[in-house]
């Protein structure tokens, strides 16, 4: 083994396998771009984003960890959301939950 060497497992890796996804239409009603990261509690995203926040409660974007989705001003797009897993406790963000979901 070489220090820093990556030895990937054979075959394909399926991200978020088994997670029940929902699709929401999101519109950026603001005058600036908005970017939302992979593990951000989507319901608490920037107020300029217009979407069903109740449906997004406890959900995050169904994208690769460490990536983000950018919404340009006036842009509308569908996004897939999956449930936040683990202990399902939310702290920080816009402080709308601050505990168990």
Swiss-Prot record:
InterPro entries xrefs: Urease_beta-like, Urease_betasu_sf, Urease_subunit
HAMAP family: Urease_beta
Hydrolase recorded as keyword: yes
Top-level enzyme category: hydrolase
UniProt organism field: Roseobacter denitrificans (strain ATCC 33942 / OCh 114)
Keywords: Cytoplasm, Hydrolase
UniProt subunit comment: Heterotrimer of UreA (gamma), UreB (beta) and UreC (alpha) subunits. Three heterotrimers associate to form the active enzyme.
Pathway membership: Nitrogen metabolism; urea degradation; CO(2) and NH(3) from urea (urease route): step 1/1
Entry protein name: Urease subunit beta
Family: Belongs to the urease beta subunit family.
CDD domains named in the record: Urease_beta
BP GO annotations: urea catabolic process
EC annotation from Swiss-Prot or TrEMBL: 3.5.1.5
């Amino acid at each position: 083994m070489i220090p820093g060497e990556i030895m990937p497992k054979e075959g394909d890796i399926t991200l978020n396998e088994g997670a029940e996804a929902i699709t929401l239409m999101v519109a950026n009603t603001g005058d600036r771009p908005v970017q939302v990261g992979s593990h951000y509690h989507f319901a608490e995203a920037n107020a300029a984003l217009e979407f069903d926040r109740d449906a997004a409660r406890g959900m995050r974007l169904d994208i690769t960890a460490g990536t983000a989705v950018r919404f340009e001003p006036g842009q509308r797009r569908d996004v897939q959301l999956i449930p936040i897993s683990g202990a399902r406790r939310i702290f920080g963000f816009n402080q709308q939950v601050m505990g168990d979901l």
